[in-house]
Amino acid sequence: FSFIALADVQAGNEINFTKSGAVQRTAMQVCPDAKFLMNAGDFVNDCNDQEWDWFYEKSCDTLMHITMAPTAGNHEGNLRWGWFDNMFNLDKSAGWNHITGVYYSFDYSNAHIAVLNTNDMYPISEEQINWLQNDMNSSDAQWKIILMHRACYSAGKNINKPDTVIMRKRLLPIIDSLDIDVVINGHDHMYLRTYQVKDDKIQPTEYITENYKG
């Protein structure tokens, strides 16, 4: 099966939300058999009523015809806690923090996908780590995928920022131990695809950073 992955469709005005909506429509045209859409976060820029209205208005013709797995981005977080939880009806896991976003998982065919909240406790709480380990260890799916907003690896300005460094140190050993096949994230506003890596060496897990064009 196929799916669409994109991120950072945020815009600060109606014109740019129209453009991001057009990108999503194009993705559907290019991949008409996609079973679902995974958005790695930052739906809006300033996280206000007007921007959310623009997002849904300009994307509704796409979103009405495909299931979306949303991720909490930092623009759904910073000083605007609670917006993400109010916008999406999700099956929230034990220990989830509705103030900063949510984390959850789902299955499709032979794949198990865990959606993480990288706004949680800069960048991720012990509760969420424990949940991820239990969640992945309880799945026997052929493909195991993680979707999150902030990245462990970056080819842009975020490469040495504290949240990226902490994410790498905190999450990489966990991801490697769980035999995750691929990690998809956003945040950097560029496209990056790594070699398969493990212990910071080229090996099993692949990391893909989506830009606004998915």
Name each region found by the language model.
Residues 1-13, 110-120, 145-149:
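Active-site-proximal beta-strand elements of phosphoester/diester hydrolases
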Residues 49-140, 144, 161-165, 170-171, ...:
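Extended active-site neighborhood of metal-dependent phosphoesterases/phosphodiesterases
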Residues 150-161:
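Active-site clefts of carbohydrate-active enzymes
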Residues 18-22, 159-178:
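Short, motif-level signal for alpha-helix interfacial/capping segments enriched in acidic residues
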Residues 5-7, 36-42, 67-74, 117, ...:
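Active-site neighborhood of phospho(di)ester-bond hydrolases with catalytic His/Asp-centered motifs
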Residues 28-30, 137, 176:
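Non-catalytic positions within long, well-ordered alpha-helices that form the structural scaffold/packing
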Residues 1-49, 122:
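N-terminal active-site segment of His-dependent metallophosphoesterases
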